[in-house]
């Protein structure tokens, strides 16, 4: 005990010495153990969310509420420069889903803090890594350095976004507690004069000048360097709290036995790099992105989706003293329009815990159990590493992390398989030290890929657990009653003991677990049970109540806080068992008012303390009975699938969307390619410069028309670049002469075209080139955003081009923003259908304009682009959340085809079946109207003269949930995007973009 007292005094002294602020506010402070927010130590349990990938602000609250319900107290947010600044000098933080004030407000309403990450560079598999796309012409100087031209380019962005972050920081009553500087920028040279050091200092100064006064953070790109820590060769540019990104899974979607080997060197890494700071993982693997041509889609990647990953990896981080953890991603969302960098396709599901459809995966449920534990386990926020290895158990097949809090004597033993990829069951005993001496805990079982946090001297409200040999989900204090929730897998043996108590009597309720007690030769009584299926309850004579819950049953256990503060104590939560989701709770007198979602009718059990006598579910009181141990039990309904009707997609109209291949097409209003120089770091292969960005066209399909005279030209050499998996075609005087379907591994390709089998004219021969676009590169690829898109060069064999013209989205970025600031220029490309707005609600498909009856199931019998249009009406039940999507099916023999899907004007899918893997495309409420008319459009690009068609296209539902969700407008998920201003209609202004 003397040693423990000495350690306790030493820890307090060290904490006092090392407790640090940024000198601007003491509302957020830190020491080697944790962050302190508003005077409270906080285990930061955060998830990454990219609001542009869910462009319906009301749905942001849905995600935040689900995060809060699953134990999260923070969200990490990138703010993408290119998303808010489509053209130089324009910054939009107000229109539609660009209105980020709603983001801050919803986070605060949900009760979660914000970690702001505004770059200027973000990465994130986002178009150009988030850098403004108007820099893609080379006008931005030396990107991500202290270069003066680049500095001048990004400064207005930080001035504007910085002020918004400052206004919403905790110092101004907002939710922002941390602000990240840049993104994964490696400090390769520790020198004060290094351009990266100067660059970091420039950004930090800019944020401070904008009023941001919360601590700065960084994120190291894996263990590749040691960057920006005040504790490691600090020559300038260091941040307040160093962070390390890690994606250690090494998992395979096609071989689930691959990988699953945890890293065990985080603790030592942080001790060597940032020993005066808490251990922070700004990006820890919540999933992984899938690329074009992948062998499987996210929904099929069982290795990434497994709850076992969350169980083992997130507890492994706890074992290494991590107290700030952000899961990347928590919710991935959708790369609608042209948000994606070329490394990903439309879906950004990321195999994240919360599915792209906003549905709860088992992985999220397991993640919740970790989050609820860290929420109330204050003893974790002051632990020292006592030891680690295989010597703490009766078998070397088990590995243990041993943490001890010198202030409270609480201990945490994180046990896992020594070989974490093992799928073999092991049973062993664990040696633990407690305030009452050493104990050997027997019969601890790990079923393959499983981990447990075994706690000792764990304080409850009115008593202390001396030890417990399974996981604590959470505990609550209800007046004089402690309620503890333990979870284990069926068949696993659990033992626990109270500290300083005589032998207690107890009563069992529910499915019997045959709890037994044994004192042996000590005054300590050990209680042992074998976990059965479902839930059992034990009430002890000291008033303590234990819920003994099977792990899978615990997936539907909830601990909604009774406060909106992100900091939640054991006295500020109640317990609910049964529903699909409990969003929040309020208590008025004896009435417990629950708001949540449910799929199927179920029993609901509520423990809220002795004052509680009635329960409301989504505003309606339900009949409840009180159990002998004090909970209230009733029944709630679910969604009625028979009330949901999903219409077929019929009544299609079709029109040619590539008349530009015909010589007679009038391109007099097109942009002339006449530049002979470029700022691009990439040299053009011919003149004039044909890089699309040099002419103000950044996103989407590009169309070129090149003319030449003479019949002696024998061929052409063209090089195009559109990003990974792009494809392109070339027509000569209306005839297809080159088809390059695309390759998932190719960013650019060359076409050597032979004209020998084609008729040329004496004058005005026309070469039409259509080039797809999968995004601008991140800086990990060559020159990043400055890698040109479009034609890199074009030459003739035996002649010269007399002119080149280019067409992209309507009016380029500037014109497209003027036409549609809500969806913004990243939504569209250069097809005639897109330029003229055929995809928009309110557009009339008139036969006089060339529209005829025609289905995408009939398709094209030659190369070209057809645009298909129809409408459908939904009448889904009010107060239902019915995630919807579009599913494509292609013929067994797939001809090269590229399809863009438009829903109410939003490009919400790129379907390329011969590359894959995506075939289904979720559409959120507000983009699709659940109780109104919807417009759907398809551009079908047949890349060969064999033509192309679909086998089927249908509207599908992913599930149905009766819900009490409300974003403040009383409509729940009945979000009419048109009425909310998210679906601007077609206007005559589109007609001029021919």
From Swiss-Prot:
Residues 1-19 form the signal peptide. GO terms for molecular function: beta-galactosidase activity. Transmembrane segments: none annotated. One of its GO terms (cellular component) is extracellular region. It catalyses: Hydrolysis of terminal non-reducing beta-D-galactose residues in beta-D-galactosides. Belongs to the glycosyl hydrolase 35 family. The active site is at 184 (proton donor), 283 (nucleophile). Its EC number is 3.2.1.23. It holds the Pfam family BetaGal_dom2. It is found in: Secreted. Keywords: Carbohydrate metabolism, Disulfide bond, Glycoprotein, Glycosidase, Hydrolase, Polysaccharide degradation, Secreted, Signal. This is Probable beta-galactosidase C. Glycans are attached at residues 88, 272, 388, 407, 433, 500, 514, 521, 584, 600, 674, 712, 717, 757, 861, 969. It comes from Aspergillus niger (strain ATCC MYA-4892 / CBS 513.88 / FGSC A1513). Its main location: secreted. SMART domains: BetaGal_dom2 (SM01029). One of its GO terms (biological process) is polysaccharide catabolic process. Disulfide bonds join 253-301. Cleaves beta-linked terminal galactosyl residues from gangliosides, glycoproteins, and glycosaminoglycans. Substrate binds at residues 78, 123-125, 183, 247, 350. The keyword Signal applies.
